[in-house]
Amino acid sequence: MKKILFMVFCIPLVINAQFNEYNPNYQWLTIKGKHVFVHFHPEAERTARVIAKIADEVWGPITSLYQYEPEPVHFVIKDIDDYSNGATYFFDNKIEIWASALDFDLRGSHNWLRNVISHEFTHMVQIQAGMKMARTIPAFYFQFLNYEEKRRPDILYGFPNVIVTYPIPTVNIPAWFAEGTAQYMRKEFNYDNWDTHRDMILRCYALDNKLLTWNQMGVFGKTSLGNESVYNAGFALTRYISQKYGENKLREITHKLGNTFNFTIDAAFKEVLGKDGNQIYNEWKSFLISDYKKRIHDVELNKIEGEIIENEGFGNFYPIFYKNNEIIYVSNKGNDYLSLSSIYLLNIKTKKSRKLVNLVNSTVSIIPNTNKIVYAKLGDDNPKWANIHDIYIYDISKDEEKRITFGMRANNPSVSNDGKKIVFIYQKDGTTNLGMVDIDGTNFKRLTLFENGEQVFNPKFSPDNSYVIFDYSYSNSREISKIDTSGANYSVIIKNGHDNRNPAFTKDGNFVYSSDITGIFNIYKYDMKNKVSIQLTNVIGGAFMPTVDDSNNLVYAGYTSDGFKLFYLSNEQQRLVDTAKKYVWTNNPPLGGDKPNGDLSRFDMNSLINYNDYNIPKYKEEKYSGFFSKLSFFPFIRYDNYVTSNTFVDRIKPGLYVSSTDYLNKYSIFAGGSINKKFERDLFLEFNYRDKLPILSSFSIYPELTLELYSVSRKTNTQLTFDPLDPTKNTNTDVTYNLFEVDLSAKNKIFTEGNYIETRFIFSQYSATIGSFIFPKTSILYPTTNDTYLIGSDIQVKFNHNGIVPTVDSDINPIGRQFEIKYDYEFNRYNKDNTYEIVDGILKPVYQHYNFHKVELNWKEYLQLRKGNTLNFTFRAAAILGPPVPDFFDFYLGGLVGMKSYPFYSVSGNKLGWLNISYRFPLWKNIDTRVGHLYVDKIYFSVYGDFGNAWTGEFPTFKDFKKGLGAEIRIKMNSFYLFPTSFFFDAAYAFDKFSRTILNEKVTYGKEWSFYGGILFDFNF
């Protein structure tokens, strides 16, 4: 019963999900601005103070555009991991900011805090302005539960075979519009603008006719490039609407999306712009293609890009020449996300490559005259389990890796030409600096002394190792700078107001670099003596990260409509560039003119545009005191068809979920309850505690504690038989079955991310309340009695491993491995035979003690045969150790969560073994169809076979094992743009027919079909 409820109870967590990570190693403080609270740990103090300043400054202009002002917003600032992002929890009035500045190859250079604070706060304002109800009601739910046929006389009803839960949210803003308006923020800020990276992405898509469709723009769930393309296209279309129809239309569209029965942006467009979504999209698309073709015309007449030498993957970066016509580089090929990139070695002539090191996203450098490379990668092997960068050396010939720094947050290393030093960047409190160590990782030396959010990138040693050249950025441009290896004599080499990056020295002491000075990133060579640059490429997309060999042949990362590829350009081809044949850059794209909202005159825009974040106001610090978000309420209506004899009204069970969390995720509470006309109840409460515990914290053990309470009741009318031979002496009465359970668990990460160990204590009590009745043919009233037939306790230890590879299909068709190992020690008092004794005139149950050990293994292996096709194995083995115990404690084999060929309660025993083999493949991907508020993305189909049994006592022969065959269809969708929707349907056939005698009744199973289905948020149940 609890398992059924748990599957349904957890549904609202999806719509209100957070990064449920709280690191108790840190002290937390709070400062208060005019409109905001900022919570931070001392290591992020500067970042927190700047954020308080920025948030108060941008509050007025952003709220003015949407004519909506939220309640005070809580910012949570983290500088724990080497991770850069912002996240807005618009139902909780909370924004999380990671202090590390974003360095993303698909984005240009901007001031991180000015950009991310304005971006996330715009999310808060715009999305709340577009809500249909108060933010405390995120969604309503409709739920449907159907159950297997009840056959066994000892159960009230079967296990669920259909589970449907579907939200009707109070917000339905498409992804492109949410992200487009957030990037737009207020255009005059110029904190985020239509930079050359954004133009590059959109230009390549438009010229190759690969723009995201109107439907695709509405949802995420794509690759790294695909998701960024939603941001990119959304920003472009938002600017188009603002410039053509007026900035005020952004507000009007937002407000129309908040109308009660408006669930698509097409309807909002029609009301505000007089055209539906497809009309606006086609109008914008036609303009883009025509405009880009005109502006790129001269470049196409003199295109100098070389040949593609690595076409696989959409993220190929940081190439360096190795030896014998070989290139070492970083690539995400074979993966859907840039975070899964690895180091490869490529032969330029044969175009064949091999992987050297897994999971590396940094630059790579070669130790001269060796077979060793130096790089950085993320890891959590440190006292605080923080996910940070450190430097490693890999010996290609020996296939050996060695870590040389520990906890430095060192990234993007480069080795000196004498092989003795390594220069790298490191991050602290939102500022990056250059550091240097010896080749073995010792003798750290700080080279730059930035303290105010400045960013440095891509350091390289000069040929004589006397200085380091690198990128520098503070706002909307990048400079190429240098500093002596002593830490003295900082100077700027190239500063022109554009984005200049990725310098790499040539043999003659000059350097090549990438610059967007023409509006398109191209490779240039800078003459150190004459201080002039020569253009080496003339591309349509973009050219980055150049490297040259001794003959001045060039390899670079070039952007195309399919992502970043590696290009090879010979020395001879580099001389063919005609600098007059260049791109026509538009300063205020797309249309060149604005139709502003006209509300900014009352704000000090000069101070917002020409900001000075070096001077930060003083704020009073206070110890964080546990701010909780407002309660969120999720009303629901459940149709619960567990007893077919119930009337329609009895099956309707209204209810409510409630949740709240403190802003640091130290504590959270989640509760729910439902009740029907018969007063059958489903109640639960979950409280999570993530703060440090005495003693354990001194050993760097920080478990998450959870308290769970369950109270469930079900009612039935049963016949009491006093004389089997005389029906007139029998009577009926109501019986209420009650389950009460308390769980206390402690969960802790072990070894590394994806591995958890959980210890749990479970106390459960099962009882039956028998209603009063009159003994037949008498006037004697038997009073209502309560029979507690089980008092159980369980100590459980569970280890979970999740090794699922992140892919765009990891929900519908996972790849990788999951397993769970579980041990229980149960000590129960159980009235097996319904035996009672009279104590003080009252019937008391006579309990028998059942104390036993229990072990269980659940293993899932998902093997990719070819792209999209997987062969999957599920293995489950379980046993109650020692002598047999009553079937009340049995394992169950079948049903929706097991061997689907047989009903859940059909096969049970003290021991269990089951093997499932399935083959899953796509029937239809990239469907890209929208029906109203529903977006249909992909359909997968699988066939599977089952072999398993459950037994008590001696191991049965294999011929007694049950066999089955089935098929499943899965459809992945999105509802209301933002909410994942997963439909599944199974049909399974049981080959083996068998009977069981239970309470003197013969029950037969097998040689029949079983059907299952559901609509949930994912397929992980």
Task: Enumerate the language-model features and the residues they cover.
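C-terminal transmembrane beta-barrel domains of outer membrane proteins
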Residues: 653-662, 668-716, 726, 731, ...
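A flexible loop/linker signature enriched in serine peptidases of the S9 family
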Residues: 195, 312-316, 331-343, 355-362, ...
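Beta/coil-rich, acidic/histidine-enriched accessory regions frequently appended to metallopeptidases
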Residues: 19-22, 27-30, 225-229, 253-357, ...
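Juxtacatalytic substrate-recognition/specificity segment
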Residues: 17-167, 174
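Outer-membrane beta-barrel initiation region
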Residues: 576-697, 800-812, 832, 911
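Hydrophobic beta-strand positions that form the internal "hydrophobic ladder"
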Residues: 327-328, 373, 422, 468, ...
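Acidic/His/Gly-enriched intrinsically disordered linker/tail segments
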Residues: 23-24, 92, 112-116, 130-244, ...
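Residue-level detector of Asp-centered blade-edge/turn motifs that repeat once per structural unit
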Residues: 322-324, 368-370, 417-418, 463-464, ...
